[in-house]
């Protein structure tokens, strides 16, 4: 789950992380009053969308007068902001963050993530801040330092020394860095984040460390522990089909391919996607209906898959353990009749009540292609489209 920059900074502030003063605007009302509350000389007007590259796209601008603030908010609010992460269609800006300006002396990079290699939360830091970290990793990887944190000890003095050294924090900056590293780690772990990125982390001319930007992703599987964070979801930034799937308890992720997938079990779903690619097609989605799906839930899953206009065929791959194949078959037929499936449909069933499930499909008189195994199913769906 992603949130906006201003929401991320509000959370970090609760963990005593230094962030610039700022206020959010949800409309063009009260612009001057909001600006006066934030600063009295320099402001930064920031578009709030779930995408990077806002500055290069014209969504982050500096104002040096209240009149400039008003004009910039009027310009940015409602604009279709195009960045390297939005695609050519861009995203409409419906929220604008007004923040006090900072006198920047140096820009650094810092992030925390769950590192699969070390099986720990790791800091990724670099003296090359304010730029695309992927470019730094490709061109000058020696400028990036990774420090993995032992969950049994948390951030130790040795970790702080390593991080401070990597970022060249000396003198008065080192104790500030020490507090910052511990606060960011606490925020990451206690909030069940999957990514926390500060780019740039700046040193001001006054020799203060400030998080000038903040990107936060939460582990969606842990949101039941944080109902207050669920309220931060901006529906306008979410995929409509993914929101609908979530409401029905389905795990759905939209992809860019042409073969819709309906599978039970995350591992089987990923294997299905791999074999579809092996045969030269591309999966249009990841969709796991789980082990206790009902006929009604399978019908809703079909509706969600077919809401994607790029879908040219559907592959159903079910291994019936907890889920019965006859229930899936009834759901497939119900969905095919209700939503008028007009694309090729290949079904592979195996497991509990498989013969009954196959019989239900055969007697339905629908144009459903049966498959004996996953390889056969993937081959048939790619040939059918």
Feature map (PLM): residue ranges:
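ATP-dependent carboxylate/acyl-activation modules
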Residues: 1-197, 202-316, 328, 337, ...
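Glycine-rich, proline-tolerant flexible connector loops at the mouths of alpha/beta enzymes
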Residues: 319-323
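Shared catalytic-loop signature of beta/alpha-barrel
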Residues: 326-330, 343
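Short internal beta-strands
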Residues: 342-351
